[in-house]
Amino acid sequence: MHVLMLSWEFPPVVVGGIARHVQDLSLALTRQGLEVTVLTAGPGEAPPVEKLGGLTIHRVRSENPRPLDLVGEVMQLNLNMLQRALGLAAGGRRFTLVHAHDWVTAYAAKALKHGLDLPLFATVHATEWGRNNGLHNDLQRYISDVEWWLCYEAWRVICCSHYMREELRRVFQVPEDKLRLIPNGVYPEDFA
């Protein structure tokens, strides 16, 4: 099995908890015998391709003019991720499924689901509604719409807490049989 994971955060790009989650999940999957390719945003100082055992990280860089706003930046990242994934597929890489993390990767995830005929799994770490205690402007409504759309397109929607599962059911009406609760893990030795 070969998982194509999409995340805008992956070390050294660490903004919140998604980077650590995706890194630890990817490494855990490789220890289980799966092959994992992560597509992520890449700063100039990070290697464009990095291998860690069965994990391969592809960091895509912006090759287009600098975007004017957040939505333009997200679209550009998705186009660059899509271009890299299609290049890997054209070069013989055979992926088994796409796993998208949060709304930022939704466009590339949907295109790969349909373009390569792959199952799509999505982990929703937080919602725009939850981050802002409601939706108060057009950008927040847009992001929430993309989050709903990602949940709709996904074969399975993964969340990390009971709270988030209930929020996804309430805000996006995600059916219970589509939701999977997989709590974040810890390394007990870090607390010894």
Cite the ranges covered by each PLM segment.
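A short beta-strand/loop micro-motif in the catalytic core of glycosyltransferases
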Residues: 98-99, 153-162, 182
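Nucleotide-sugar donor phosphate/pyrophosphate-binding loop at the beta->alpha transition
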Residues: 118-121, 129-149
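Alpha-helix capping/helix-boundary segments
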Residues: 104-105, 163-165
